[in-house]
Amino acid sequence: MTIRYPNGKRYNQALQPQKTKMKKHTYGNRGMSLEEELNETNQYYLSHNIACVHKKPTPLQIVKVDYPARSAAVVREAYFKQPSTTDYNGVYKGKYIDFEAKETKNKTNFPLQNFHLHQIEHMKQVIAHDGIAFVIIKFTLYNEIYLLDAKHVISFWNRKDTGGRKSITKQEIEEHGSLLSCGYHPRIDYISILDMVYFS
């Protein structure tokens, strides 16, 4: 399937053979991706009436569809309707929350190239309208997950734009962010950090 951005450029996804993974059924479930862990966490928060947070769908314009069988449709070409903003949004304690989730295999830093300008602008707008914007970053080699307020991400982005570092060091994330605790339910307890940082 061919997917294109609004400007007509082709979206190139790394084409690798799909491997069937057996999920580990351990307490930490280290085989789970950050997105899967957050989706499970958000489902827990919703089912226990703690918060209402959902993953935003990526808006696609489908252009070409093949029907190899009557009951099957295969999308062959699609375009991104518009640049996506952040991954998740919702409401907690009457406040709008909006966040991006990112993973890195780097040991010592998080590359700012993992963000796009429109995501930074979106986070600025959320803050300007008194919403809560942040980023959840997972260092997969350490299995450590941090919550970093968007104002810090914006500051590091501005530093990059003025000729500074093109990444956020792990030390800076540890200093300005909060280490999230991981467990069974909720899997990634970011709400307890929101309580400490934004509601105390």
UniProtKB/Swiss-Prot annotation:
Its main location: cytoplasm. SUPFAM superfamilies: Restriction endonuclease-like. Binds 1 Mg(2+) ion per subunit. The record marks 102 as: Transition state stabilizer. It comes from the Bacteria. Its cofactor is Mg(2+). The keyword Coiled coil does not apply. HAMAP family: RecU. This is Holliday junction resolvase RecU. It comes from Bacillus cytotoxicus (strain DSM 22905 / CIP 110041 / 391-98 / NVH 391-98). The lineage of its organism: Bacteria, Bacillati, Bacillota, Bacilli, Bacillales.
